[in-house]
Amino acid sequence: NVLPPGDRLNIDALAERLGVSPTPIREGLARLAAENLVDFRSYRGYFVKKMLTPQELTDLFDVRKVLEIHAVRRGAARPGMSRLVEMERLLYEMGGPNLEPEFHEYGRFSILDQRFHEALLGLAESPALLDAWRALNVHVAASRFFRSSGLVDVQHSVTEHAAILGALVAGDTDAAVRAVDVHIDAGLRRSLAGSPTPVGPLDAGVEPFVPNEGPM
């Protein structure tokens, strides 16, 4: 079951549902609160974190863009074949024959999307950079899920990912930066619109890398 933003988290009810004692539930919620993933209110308990405001979401996307563009500029000149192959494999899974342009398997898509971007961040070979991105992405992914009711924009995300990968394969750092910029801006606009409908240009000015017959 999905608890809507702002709902109170009942420790005893959660413990009963999960078949555990209240202690690990309480400890887990305390840790989530420390990481700003749930809200704690004195004398009232824990609550599902409220949905980010449009400005808060915009701020997170802005920081995410800075991190990803930095990773591209730092590592695009020497990405390594194994990393490109991994990104190509993930791209194929996101846009493979078993997925429709729009579908409700948000959890599956979210995992693939996160792994693609983690591979992109890996270009910088900086654990600190990757950790910072992951901390942001938790909130971005949750907000996107609630705003879109779990419906994800597979087709357009794959197109944008393909432009990023195409630029990296071509060794064009500037084009890769433009592709990341376009993708993050388009993702923000779609998230704010609460719909998978494209609301911005998808063309980053590079030839996309499109896997038609499966990964390399």
Task: Describe the role of every protein-language-model region.
Residues 1-77, 193-216:
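Short linear motifs at protein or domain termini
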